[in-house]
């Protein structure tokens, strides 16, 4: 049996530190080795204790979590899980943290929540196991192709991601031209975060990116992100495909679920689709991607070396669902090739 993941809990609230410590300490594979109430205490604790993982509150006195994270990633890179309030402001800060290099995020529980921090221990263990090189500089982002350079086919693109997906999706979608194929995405994320993430992607990418709404028509040049929370994203509609938000129990522990999205794309589009599974914990999306491949779709998976967590892509690959495994930097361009988004004048 491997040694427990050693965690430092950083939060200015003694109550929240106690709750996080209690939740993590209930898992025998996790050991809370220290607590800190602000960035100064945390800096000294990191030097003294050398934790495997840090949980870090976004909002703290003196130096906020975002500024402290930047210092960690510059001076002593390590896996950091951000703990944020479930507000628009908290979501914006958390998304910025994930782009800086935070491993993942969790939302602070609301009043009466049944299982506060229910998946935190699993995220901590995944963070401790990760082989990611946190000190690697981010790759330069190439400008997106121009609209005039491409003509788009009739295929739908479906993408699923979880831990590490914020950075991965930005890397993929920034390769898309403004007239990209209709694209639907399920990214595991707390409920209030997906709207902020869609807005952020819309600012960073050439196509229009929006949080999916029930009945929204799938259109060229638009990307639809499943809202976090109570419903799953599906596609339906035959010759006039649209987004559907459906009430169903969680699948693979998730709502929205990547499997639910991929299943619906397989049924609606068959061979006229491309399925992509990116970095993430667990197995959500693997069975759905296999269904897409059996229906004739082209399927891609992210390579282990470029994943933050090689979980979902690994299971999909082992099931035979992945036609090609590619490094993250190559996935966007391959999607365009497979959707017949070719340069004008070529056949």
Swiss-Prot record:
Organism: Rhizobium etli (strain ATCC 51251 / DSM 11541 / JCM 21823 / NBRC 15573 / CFN 42)
Family label: Belongs to the CheB family.
Keywords, comma-separated and alphabetical: Chemotaxis, Cytoplasm, Hydrolase, Phosphoprotein
Places the protein is found: Cytoplasm
Domain annotation CheB-type methylesterase: ranges: 150-342
Any one Gene Ontology molecular-function term assigned to this protein's record: protein-glutamine glutaminase activity
Primary enzyme class: hydrolase
GO biological process: chemotaxis
NCBIfam families per UniProt: PRK00742.1, PRK12555.1
The keyword Ribosomal protein is assigned to this record: no
Enzyme Commission number: 3.1.1.61, 3.5.1.44
SUPFAM superfamilies listed in its UniProt record: CheY-like, Methylesterase CheB, C-terminal domain
Name of the molecule in the record: Protein-glutamate methylesterase/protein-glutamine glutaminase
Modified residues (4-aspartylphosphate): 57
Domain annotation Response regulatory: ranges: 6-123
Keyword Hydrolase listed: yes
Pfam families associated with the record: CheB_methylest, Response_reg
Coiled coil stretches, renumbered: none
Gene for this chain: cheB
């Amino acid at each position: 049996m491997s040694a427990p993941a050693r965690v430092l809990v950083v939060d200015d609230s003694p109550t929240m530190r106690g709750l996080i410590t209690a939740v993590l300490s209930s898992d025998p594979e996790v050991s809370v080795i220290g607590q800190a109430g602000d960035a100064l205490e945390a800096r000294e604790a990191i030097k003294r204790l050398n934790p495997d993982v840090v949980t870090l509150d976004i909002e703290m006195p003196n130096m906020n979590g975002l500024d402290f994270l930047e210092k960690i990633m510059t001076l002593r890179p390590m896996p950091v899980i951000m703990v944020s309030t479930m507000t628009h402001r908290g979501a914006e800060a958390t998304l910025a943290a994930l782009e800086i290099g935070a491993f993942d995020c969790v939302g602070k529980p609301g009043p009466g929540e049944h299982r506060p921090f229910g998946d935190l221990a699993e995220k901590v263990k995944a963070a401790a196991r990760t082989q990611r090189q946190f000190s690697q500089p981010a790759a330069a982002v190439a400008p997106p192709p121009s609209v005039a350079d491409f003509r788009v086919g009739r295929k739908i693109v479906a993408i699923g991601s979880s831990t590490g997906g914020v950075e991965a999706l930005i890397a993929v979608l920034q390769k898309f031209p403004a007239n990209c194929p209709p694209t639907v995405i399920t990214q595991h994320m707390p409920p209030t975060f997906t709207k902020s993430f869609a807005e952020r992607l819309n600012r960073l990418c050439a196509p229009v990116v929006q949080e999916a709404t029930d009945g929204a028509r799938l259109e060229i040049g638009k990307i639809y992100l499943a809202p976090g929370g109570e419903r799953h994203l599906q596609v339906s509609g035959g010759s006039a495909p649209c987004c559907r938000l459906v009430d169903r129990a969680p699948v693979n522990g998730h709502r929205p679920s990547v499997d639910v999205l991929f299943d619906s794309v397989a049924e609606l589009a068959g061979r006229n689709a491309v399925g992509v599974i990116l970095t993430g914990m667990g197995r959500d999306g693997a069975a759905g991607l296999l269904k897409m491949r059996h229906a004739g779709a082209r399927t891609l998976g992210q390579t282990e070396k470029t994943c933050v967590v090689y979980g979902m892509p690994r299971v999909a690959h082992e099931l035979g669902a992945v036609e090609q495994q590619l490094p993250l930097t190559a996935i966007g361009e391959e999607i365009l090739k497979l959707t017949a988004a070719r340069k004008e004048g070529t056949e």
